[in-house]
C-alpha cells in the first residue's frame, strides 16, 4: 500500500496590482506551504506559463481571476485555489515643463505647460500658494512649482514640475507735454518723457519722425507716441508727448 501526498493549492487570495508593472509572478501569492510547479490558468481556461502575467495590458479597474492547480498523484483528488487580481492605475503627472510669463501678464494654467499626457486632479505646491492650478504674476513668486498625483497602493505617487520665470516689460516712461516756438531748434522727444523710458523704441505722430527728433521748422505739432516692445512674451507699452507750437 502506497500513501500519496494529497495536493495542496492553499487558500484563495486576492490582491491589487498597479498597471505600471510589466511582469508579475502569481506564485508569490501562494502560501509558504504550497508547492510551486502546478499550473496557472485564467478565465477561458487559458494557460499562464510559469504563472507570470503582464498587468500593464489591463485597463484600470479590471478584475482578473486566476486558478492554481498543483499536480495531484492518483488516486488523490485535484485541489485548486482562486487568485483574484484587481488592476489599479499608476498616476501620470506628465513631464517637467517651463512657463515664461510677463510680469504684467494675465494668469496662466500651469497644467497646460506640463509635457506628456498628465492626469488631472493633482495638487500644486511651490513658492506661492496655488489656487486652481493658476500662476498669477500679479500676486505670485516665480520659481519651481510641483504637481503631484497620489497613487492608490500599491501604485506610487507621481510628480512633475513647472519652472516659472517672469519677463519684465520695457518701460516707455510717462506722458509729457512741451510748448515750442516755430523757430526753435530741434530737440529729442524722449527728453520730454517722464520717468525712465527704455531706449530703442519707435515714434509715431502727425509727422514722420527720425531718431525721436522733433524739428519745429518742418514738423506738425500734436500727439507723438513712443512705443517699446518686449521682451517676449511681454507686449508693447506706450507713452505720449504732446507738442504745441506758439
Predicted features along the sequence, with ranges:
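Proline- and Ser/Thr-rich low-complexity, intrinsically disordered segments
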Residues: 1-246
Amino acid at each position: 500500500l502506497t500513501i500519496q501526498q494529497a495536493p495542496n493549492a492553499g487558500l484563495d487570495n486576492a490582491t491589487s496590482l498597479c498597471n505600471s508593472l510589466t511582469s508579475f509572478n502569481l506564485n508569490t501569492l501562494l502560501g509558504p506551504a504550497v508547492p510551486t510547479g502546478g499550473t496557472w490558468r485564467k478565465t477561458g481556461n487559458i494557460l499562464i506559463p510559469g504563472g507570470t502575467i503582464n498587468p500593464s495590458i489591463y485597463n484600470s479597474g479590471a478584475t482578473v481571476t486566476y486558478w492554481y492547480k498543483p499536480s495531484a498523484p492518483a488516486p488523490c483528488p485535484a485541489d485548486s485555489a482562486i487568485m483574484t487580481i484587481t488592476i489599479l492605475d499608476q498616476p501620470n503627472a506628465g513631464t517637467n515643463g517651463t512657463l515664461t510669463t510677463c510680469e504684467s501678464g494675465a494668469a496662466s494654467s500651469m497644467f497646460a505647460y506640463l509635457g506628456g499626457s498628465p492626469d488631472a486632479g493633482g495638487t500644486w505646491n511651490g513658492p506661492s500658494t496655488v489656487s486652481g492650478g493658476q500662476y498669477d504674476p500679479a500676486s505670485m513668486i516665480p520659481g519651481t512649482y510641483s504637481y503631484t498625483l497620489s497613487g492608490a497602493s500599491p501604485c506610487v505617487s507621481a510628480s512633475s514640475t513647472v519652472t516659472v520665470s517672469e519677463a519684465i516689460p520695457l518701460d516707455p516712461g510717462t506722458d509729457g507735454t512741451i510748448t515750442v516756438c516755430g523757430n526753435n531748434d530741434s530737440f529729442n522727444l524722449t527728453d520730454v518723457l517722464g520717468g525712465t523710458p527704455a531706449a530703442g523704441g519707435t515714434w509715431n505722430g502727425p509727422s514722420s519722425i527720425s531718431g525721436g527728433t522733433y524739428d519745429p521748422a518742418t514738423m506738425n505739432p500734436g500727439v507723438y507716441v513712443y512705443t517699446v516692445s518686449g521682451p517676449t512674451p511681454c507686449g508693447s507699452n506706450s507713452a505720449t508727448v504732446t507738442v504745441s507750437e506758439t
